From Swiss-Prot:
This is L-tryptophan decarboxylase cnsB. It comes from Penicillium expansum (Blue mold rot fungus). It catalyses: L-tryptophan + H(+) = tryptamine + CO2. L-tryptophan decarboxylase; part of the gene cluster that mediates the biosynthesis of communesins, a prominent class of indole alkaloids with great potential as pharmaceuticals. Communesins are biosynthesized by the coupling of tryptamine and aurantioclavine, two building blocks derived from L-tryptophan. Its EC number is 4.1.1.105. It comes from the Eukaryota.
Length: 454
């Protein structure tokens, strides 16, 4: 499979009739089909997708996977190991255990740290908040438990809190400052007010690389609050924890190693195939306290120092998820992986500089990592009309195959969001895309939006 070029379509999407036709034509029948025709059908099915590896695809954090990850994934599927326990998977389990120690070291966790590979950030967050609940909340007081997030926290946190039984009224949403970082002063006051009302604060969720802007919460300050208040600090580093592998930008995540738990996605900024998620805990016993099980049909014997991963995760049967990442890092080394991450910083800063060169464009948030949020603001239009215009511009960029730059909401207003994590993309590509975007924006019809230009 060749990587797409700029002239290839960024996305191909089924419409309703095509969906019906595909489902009717390609579902299994009573008679066998020849392999060659089914391979062609497979390619036809996968052709209808967003090409995240396209050089003009800037819409999602999950990055272009390294070909090395494909090879590691191929071996993982080929051997089809059930990495559930040491007795059936001692080799892959040993490497998963080793990778957990190595990753924990990269983010500054102590030697006592542990963890496991999971399907992605959502499952990593779920595992971490279960561990926090079981460590700090007595079962009879769970209805009083209170969690502190920010207005930039990823939706997976709210989802996993709901799954494990917490109601909306138990979740505090702390405002962020002008840098889109959790406001620690408001956090302190909110915790104090909750204690006065008889509630039981137990968990603070920090973000290391928010999805909206790439912002990183003040990790040291939040760790101080958590330590002083006796709370569990979870850092959602699904996107930004990878910055720890960069020599040039590692300082941005200073303090992440003070967390009680960290979620991390290899399929975001470590260039892995889906699904490569990691949950790390400061204390290796934390996950076992929540997930360890036994049964008469489990006959696993574990040598001293080894691990049965079914005791560290909600899952029992599980693939050897660590192997593709191990394979990639074993070949590349940490330094080259860090340089690939650095390229995302370069591309984002190039985009910011180029956008600022043109009139009527506004950068809406500081560029921290590889995300730029911005807005086209020609004079004479109201905010609501600008929202409509930016939505239309995003749609047209994709429809005309210029770029996939989707939208988000920043402080209640529509913003264009650019995310560059493909290490193969060069800065001159960004320059050309921004130029094309500006040219297109200047030709957008604005009749009915307070001014008339067609």
């Amino acid at each position: 499979m060749n990587s797409p070029t700029a002239s290839d379509p960024i996305v191909r999407t089924l419409d309703a009739p095509e969906t019906k036709d595909m489902q009717e034509a390609f579902l299994p029948g009573e008679s066998p089909q020849d392999v060659a025709s089914v391979i062609q059908e497979t390619m036809d099915i996968f052709d209808k997708r967003m090409r995240l590896t396209h050089p003009h695809c800037f819409c999602y954090v999950p990055s272009c996977p390294s070909p090395l990850a494909w090879v590691g994934d191929l071996f993982t599927s080929l051997y089809n190991v059930n990495a559930v326990s040491w007795d059936v998977s001692s080799g892959p389990s040993a490497m998963e255990q080793g990778m957990i120690r190595w990753l924990a070291q990269q983010v500054g966790l102590p030697p006592s740290a542990g963890g496991c590979f999971v399907s992605g950030g959502s499952m990593a967050n779920l595992s971490a908040v279960v561990a926090a609940r079981d460590k700090l909340l007595p079962p009879m007081r769970r209805a009083e438990g209170t969690i502190y997030t920010s207005d930039q926290t990823h939706i997976s946190i709210k989802k996993c809190l709901h799954i494990i039984g917490f109601d909306e009224h138990q979740i505090r949403v702390i405002p962020t400052d002008h840098l889109f970082r959790m406001d620690t002063d408001i956090l302190r006051r909110t915790i104090a007010a909750d204690r006065q009302c008889g509630r039981l604060p137990f968990l603070v969720v920090a973000s290391c690389g928010t999805t909206n802007t790439g912002s990183i919460d003040p990790l040291h300050a939040l760790a101080d609050v958590a330590e002083e208040e006796g709370l569990w600090l979870h850092v959602d580093g699904a996107y930004g924890a990878s910055i720890a592998l960069s020599d040039k930008y590692r300082h941005l995540v200073d303090g992440i190693g003070r967390a009680d738990s960290i979620s991390w996605d290899g399929h975001k900024w470590l260039f892995q195939t889906y699904g490569c998620g990691i949950v790390l805990t400061r204390d290796s016993a934390s996950l076992a306290h929540s997930f360890a099980v036994d049964a008469e049909y489990i006959n696993s014997t574990t040598p001293h120092g080894a691990v049965n991963f079914y005791n560290l995760s909600p899952e029992l049967s599980r693939p050897a998820r660590a192997m593709p990442l191990w394979f990639t890092l074993r070949v590349l080394g940490r330094r080259q992986m860090g340089e690939m991450i650095d390229q995302g910083f370069l591309l984002a800063r190039t985009a910011e500089e180029e956008i600022r060169r043109y009139p009527h464009w506004v950068i809406l948030a500081p560029v921290t990592a590889s995300i730029v949020v911005f807005r086209y603001c020609p004079l004479g239009l109201k905010d609501d009309d600008l929202d409509t215009l930016n939505l239309a511009l995003s749609a047209r960029l994709l429809a005309e195959n210029v770029a996939s730059i989707l939208t988000t909401n920043i402080r209640g207003r529509v913003a264009l969001r650019f995310c560059a994590t493909n290490p193969a993309t060069q800065a001159d590509t960004i320059t050309k895309v921004v130029q094309q975007m500006d040219q297109m924006a200047n030709t957008m019809p604005t009749c009915g939006l307070g001014m008339c230009k067609e």
